[in-house]
Amino acid sequence: MNQERYLKAIDERCSRRTYITKDIEVEKVNSLQRCIKNLNEMSGLNLQLQLNGPKLFKGFSSSYGMLKGVGAYFALVGSKDDKDLLEKVGYFGEILALEATALGLGTCWIGGTYDRKLCAKLIDLKENEELVAIITVGYTPVDKTFKEKMISKLSHR
């Protein structure tokens, strides 16, 4: 992604927790997969795009009711032995979020309000790897929902 595209995505990006039922087009999935391949080569991480969001985010208990309609997510995975794992996941994960934003998709970083054991079964997780976080991704309503506005107010003081 070029610098101008990044700067525009930085200005546009905001956390979105409500998604609409619309599959991400093949061209956009392919673009995200190319980005992931490049980032994994640069970082040594095992970032993944998963299109099985409904399996992971079904029901209230899996996300405390804070997410709705999740169809896809990025699994942010890396080696347990990497002393810089958290820093790398933060840096390269945000690049993924910006790439998704540039493609017209919404994103939300999720640290712990999902079923980690189920997620580990749904993704490609090797024995020496750790799932650090996920980023939900997909199409969102044009305007934030009332719930999203309230959550945003509570989390940004």
Task: Label each residue range with its predicted role.
Residues M1-R157:
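Acidic, surface-exposed loops and disordered segments
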